[in-house]
Amino acid sequence: IHIQGMNQPSLEVFERDLYAACAGKEALILDVRNNGGGWTTDRVLASIMAPVHAWTTPRGADPAMTGHYPQDRLFIQRTTMPINLLCNEKSYSNAEIMSHAFKTVGRGTLVGMPTHGSVISTGSFSLEDGTTVRMPFRGWYVADQSPRDMELNGAIPDLMIPQTPEDESTQTDTQLKVALEDLLKRVR
């Protein structure tokens, strides 16, 4: 699933597509490449980190029939299947926070190229002449053994795979191919 932006419209598409994309599948690849950011990392993480605490079966069915949970009971769509996340040097801001978070919590393999390192929270206000000024008001830090400021410190993939001009000209997605191969090793 490609997450185009870390914003409400993209979140709604992600939540809709998550259920369909996971049906009958064993693994999932999320893609935040070429994503300018936004604010929805925590909501996406909630969908891929929610634990399975129970399952249901219809009355009289074999109780060994596992894996079904009533979708109307879920607050958000969720998956617990193996996941890899794609990022690149055009993953900015909240897409970088997503990449750092995915790696920090160990949810799967981060694949691609290091993100740009452009992570801050900004607000904006208008001046009397009608221009708008944006000001940073918050820094973001990786929550691991050595907290690092995400500003100027992009997320470093577990598998660094460049997307070359030759790949682009032949429409070959080497990063996606490597992410898929890595997932197949984990599910087999």
Residue ranges and their predicted role:
Residues 1-128, 168-174, 181-187:
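Cleft-lining beta-strand/loop regions that shape enzyme active-site pockets
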Residues 107-166:
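C-terminal structured "cap/appendage" subdomains that terminate the fold
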